[in-house]
Curated annotation (Swiss-Prot):
PROSITE patterns: CLP_PROTEASE_HIS, CLP_PROTEASE_SER. Signal peptide: none annotated. Cleaves peptides in various proteins in a process that requires ATP hydrolysis. Has a chymotrypsin-like activity. Plays a major role in the degradation of misfolded proteins. It catalyses: Hydrolysis of proteins to small peptides in the presence of ATP and magnesium. alpha-casein is the usual test substrate. In the absence of ATP, only oligopeptides shorter than five residues are hydrolyzed (such as succinyl-Leu-Tyr-|-NHMec, and Leu-Tyr-Leu-|-Tyr-Trp, in which cleavage of the -Tyr-|-Leu- and -Tyr-|-Trp bonds also occurs). Keywords: Cytoplasm, Hydrolase, Protease, Serine protease. This is ATP-dependent Clp protease proteolytic subunit. Belongs to the peptidase S14 family. InterPro entries: ClpP, ClpP/crotonase-like_dom_sf, ClpP/TepA, ClpP_His_AS, ClpP_Ser_AS. The lineage of its organism: Bacteria, Bacillati, Bacillota, Bacilli, Lactobacillales. The active site is at residues 96, 121.
Length: 196
């Protein structure tokens, strides 16, 4: 069930679902697994807010275990494409593809709540259902390219050498807010009274 907010306006009462009300304040909630439908919704909101006023920041709250690489990269590319600065605020967790999205916020405007967590690791993949050796080889090569691409993005976003990111992402690597700050994925640990 999605909560509804009722506001008094000059014309009487207006009711909004909570996400529409937050969107009026340029707040987007990226929660749950990253998949195509969710990514399309996030992208549409980013484009709408940028078209509405590209001089104002957009606030992207992130709480995700990660998910689809292609869906996540579509969000990242849109964040980089629009003119509005995108503040990212990690609450709960940003794991896997979520770290790529959250760390791609505008530098200087990437935040994390004190008890949130970050997790980087190498991408997972399969053979795409093919059982032929050539299909498996193609899938393995694609997975390596994907890993290199994601590690380059994480290196660029954190300021760490790609070799360090490669080693650190070999297995699930969980980080506290302080460790995430020291790594360079965020710019500040946000106190609860700083939230928009």
């Amino acid at each position: 069930m999605i909560p509804v907010v009722i506001e008094q306006t000059s014309r009487g009462e207006a009711s909004y679902d909570i996400y529409s009300r937050l969107l009026k304040d340029r707040i987007i909630m990226l929660t749950g697994p990253v998949e195509d439908n969710m990514a399309n919704s996030i992208i549409a909101q980013l484009l709408f807010l940028d078209a509405q006023d590209n001089t104002k920041d957009i606030y992207l709250y992130v709480n995700t275990p990660g998910g689809s690489v292609s869906a996540g990269l579509a969000i990242v590319d849109t964040m980089n494409f629009i003119k509005s600065d995108v503040q990212t605020i990690v609450m709960g967790m940003a794991a896997s593809m979520g770290t790529v999205i959250a760390s791609s916020g505008t530098k200087g405007k990437r935040f994390m709540l004190p008890n949130a967590e970050y997790m980087i690791h190498q991408p997972m993949g399969g053979t795409g259902g093919g059982t032929q050796q050539t299909d498996m080889a193609i899938a393995a090569e694609h997975l390596l390219k994907t890993r290199n691409n994601l590690e380059q993005i994480l290196a660029d976003n954190s300021g760490q050498p790609i070799e360090k990111v490669h080693v650190d992402a070999e297995r699930d690597n969980w980080m506290s807010a302080q460790e995430t700050l020291e790594y360079g994925f965020i710019d500040e640990i946000m106190a609860n009274n700083q939230l928009k």
